[in-house]
């Protein structure tokens, strides 16, 4: 297959780091904690997961409900939202960067989930359709995470290698076990809330006859599950309002940590170049360097040195040139000049990290 290894590491490198040192190194990685914290404190967001199924099962009358066929189509369409988010994610990341997309999609998710509140309060006919439309937007935004999560995790591991000189990916899982403890501690919160709003055996027993009258089921059938209390409209509505509130709180908490994620695409590209230089120097020291590695390293160093005293170009003037360009050909040329100017300024920033890496050998500590 035409694949290429993306991990930058010297061919002659042998990992030499103690277990506890590796754990401590990961524990000091701020970016790792930012991403982990976003997941841990956002656990409430998934509370809405049962809304469609509960709405169909417990709030689906003949007068204003939907049939089994339409419900199947609804669930299929909502689930299909994941596809479009995953397709759009790479283009959005390329245009705006991972951090901006992370914040925007998660913040928009909180807004979308809040739209469930007026729907649940109003209880319109065929409410499940309104809920499905809103959840389609939620699934669409959430699916960006399928692409973003592994991309961000890869950047975090490159950053860890940049800090420590070692590729210790396995330690992230070890330190991440803290999340298992947090999950255990928080897993009982949502069931406790359900019980508080009336989804419990006591409420079921006291209102079993009412449920039997609504559903036509026997008392023994009604008593099979405490969730049967959701057939009672006031409990159903109260439960759904609480679910929406918890989901919005979870979604809001989820995106706040991303404001502290400071790994930009530009910085990540610079880190990769620095890692390539380090790999070249290590292979050189071990006598396994080939001609291609030497040429690549020289190109990186020469490019960085040539940009050392370069002045950034005025991007605003290039943008104005695009707006004022007259004719299709002139506008195309102006856009190309703008793109080249942006790339030029980016290379200046990347070169700063590369030059810092090369020039560190001139310092007294070396």
Model regions and ranges:
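Membrane-embedded alpha-helical bundles of multi-pass transporters/translocases
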Residues: 1-289, 293, 319, 326, ...
